[in-house]
Amino acid sequence: MPTDTITIFDTTLRDGEQSPGCSMKTAEKLEVASALVDLGVDVIEAGFPIASPGDFEAVQMVSRQFGDRATICGLARCRQEDVDRAWGALQDAERRRLHVFLATSSIHMEHKLKMDEKQIVKTAVEMVQRAADYCEDVEFSPEDAARTELDFLCEVVEKAIEAGATTINIPDTVGYATPAQFGSVFRHLKENVSNIGQAVLSAHCHNDLGLAVANSLAAVGEGARQVECTINGLGERAGNAALEEIVMALATRGDYFECDTRVNTDKLFPTSRLVSSITGMKVQRNKAIVGQNAFAHEAGIHQDGWLKEPTTYEIMRPEDVGVPGTDLVPVSYTHLTLPTILLV
């Protein structure tokens, strides 16, 4: 039986919107936010307030309308103006979180930031402290953590926790990690950061190698208790870990992970379709959990087994994820021979 509850951090309105062609108007973001609240996600990252006036307005409106039902989060670079702007958008929420990030990998420090390790640590500490002065719920992300030298990652994480970070999010920013390697990062942090018990460990994975969900679950296996994800796996480039896949993996394999979530799984399918309709990003037919074929059976042997006992070929029920009845999950006999049909 599950013994721990995983915090589901939804970033559809921030990272998901960064999918090319997926920008949303404020009214559309509010519609998605309402669906996410009904879905039961714990944290909604509503946007990047300093990015544009529209993003600021969206975070502010989501904070005002839903900040008493979910934790509303705003993203900020480790810059004073970013943190101040994010707080301005979030301050009306009853439950709010400031999420600050700073790259820590050698390639980002050298080529993007032009900063050395000492400067990175100093900046991270100062901006986490500034965020903590505003808000008791502060998340720190060492961007590109999956490609960061582990000893330096431990140093930055320890200093960020000392400065007031309550969640430490480990991003696989470019989708480079593999499950065993990504899990080992979490294990290393738990073994080498003296104050790691004072913060929640989180995973944020991109899908460039098709491993975002697998890497996130590997992190859960090594102690992550928050997973950052998006509806339908929307996100930069190849996308993020798909929320519906994370949630149903934990629900279906609770015997293995010994974890569950607070998500109302019967709202996964309608939420998926809402996001698809608003963004214009179609859900591929064979997409796990919410694809049109997810509960369809074509092979005659499979149909025969399903008709006798659905669990022979289905590890979850359509109604568990909100698929509205068998009309959307037809069992076709077109490939069954007459003798096979008569034997069913």
Regions found by a protein language model. Name each.
Residues 257-292:
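Phosphate/diphosphate-binding loops
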Residues 8-11, 44-46, 70-76, 96, ...:
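Hydrophobic faces of well-ordered beta-strands that scaffold small-molecule active sites
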Residues 334-340:
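Conserved small/polar residues in nucleotide/adenosyl-binding loops
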Residues 224-239:
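Glycine-rich phosphate-binding active-site loops on the catalytic face of alpha/beta enzymes
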Residues 26-39, 80, 84-100, 104-110, ...:
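Alpha/beta enzyme core
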Residues 42-67, 105-113, 170-179, 237:
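Glycine-rich, proline-tolerant flexible connector loops at the mouths of alpha/beta enzymes
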Residues 12-28, 77-78, 111-117, 141-151, ...:
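Active-site mouth loops of central-metabolism enzymes
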Residues 1-79:
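N-terminal capping/small domains of soluble enzymes
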